[in-house]
Structures are given as structure tokens and as C-alpha cells.
Amino acid sequence: MNKTLGIYVTSDRHLEKLILLCKAAKKKGVAVKVFFTHEGTRLCTDPEMEALAGIVDVALCKVGFESLELDESKTSLDRSAYSSQSWHAEMIYDCDRYLTF
């Protein structure tokens, strides 16, 4: 059985630690799902986010992103990554372990 780690990101800090954690999990064969919400959606406009491409399954709260008036053109995420809290709820259900930043 594959292991899955869920990461809930509400803070606009610690992107470097998040990236290192995701890379370490991938190296160990652990699938990772990350959901960005509230202030955490600010990280989605950071160019460093590209380091997560192909490593993790990423979604972000569309309402949170829009409420902060962030620029969609500044993110490398695909339009399909914009989601709702229901994705977060499914992530909790599907994951073996769950962390919050």
C-alpha cells in the first residue's frame, strides 16, 4: 500500500521547509498532497513553487486566493489547481498522515 502525506498550508511562511519536506517524502516513496488556503495562497505566487511541480498533488483555495486579490498570472499552477475546501476534506480522508503549516 502506498503511503500518502497531506499538508495543509495556511501560513505564508516556511516555503523552503515545505519544499524540502515534499522532496524528502518523494525520495522515500511517499505521495504528497498539498492544499493552500488563506494566507498560504500567497506562497502560490512565489517562483520557488515550481520546485513542487511533478513532486506533489497541489490544490489551492480559490476563494482564499481571490480574497487576497492575488495575481493569477504570477503563479505557475494550472487552472485546475484552483479548488474549494471540499478538496481539502477529501485530502484528509485519503491521507495516512496530515501536517499543518
Segments the model singles out, each with a brief description of its role:
Residues 29, 55-56, 95-96:
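Short, well-ordered alpha-helix to beta-strand connector turns
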Residues 73-101:
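C-terminal structural segments of small proteins and small subunits
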Residues 4-16, 38-39:
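Short, glycine-rich nucleotide/cofactor-binding loops
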Residues 31-40:
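A short beta-strand-loop structural module common to alpha/beta enzyme folds
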Residues 5, 32, 58:
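Hydrophobic anchor at the start of a short beta-strand
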Residues 48-75:
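A glycine-rich helix N-cap at a beta->alpha junction
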Residues 14-27, 34:
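Histidine-anchored nucleotide/phosphate-binding helix
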